[in-house]
Amino acid sequence: MPIPVKLPPTFADVLEKAEQPLVGAWICSGSEAAAEIIASAGFSWTLIDGEHSPYGLETILSLLRATDAYGVTRVVRVPVNNTALIKQYLDLGVQNLMVPMID
């Protein structure tokens, strides 16, 4: 029997369907509780900042899990423009990436 999976909308979908300006919040704390509060606060999107923080893959995964239940669109900023690292973030289930330092 197939297991239904409901993913949050992508950031592009949220932008496309927006009829008014969108408001989002950046998650700059490694706290799952803080991430959960932000995700449940009614923002259009949240961004988990992996560039200007000491987060490893484990912390990113725990923040994604903490915000899963709220259906908010999540963007994750990776620390560097590195193909191998970006693939690891995608393996975690990240749907929307912000990649820094692209020339």
Which residues fall in each region the model found?
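N-terminal amphipathic alpha-helix/helix-capping segment at the start of soluble metabolic enzymes
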Residues: 1-28
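Active-site-adjacent beta->alpha loops and helix N-cap segments on the catalytic face
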Residues: 2-12, 52-70, 81-87, 101-103
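Generic ordered-secondary-structure signal
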Residues: 3-6, 25, 35-36, 40, ...
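Hydrophobic faces of well-ordered beta-strands that scaffold small-molecule active sites
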Residues: 21-26, 46-48, 74-78, 97-99
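Short, flexible loop/turn motifs enriched in small residues
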Residues: 31
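Glycine-rich, proline-tolerant flexible connector loops at the mouths of alpha/beta enzymes
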Residues: 34-62
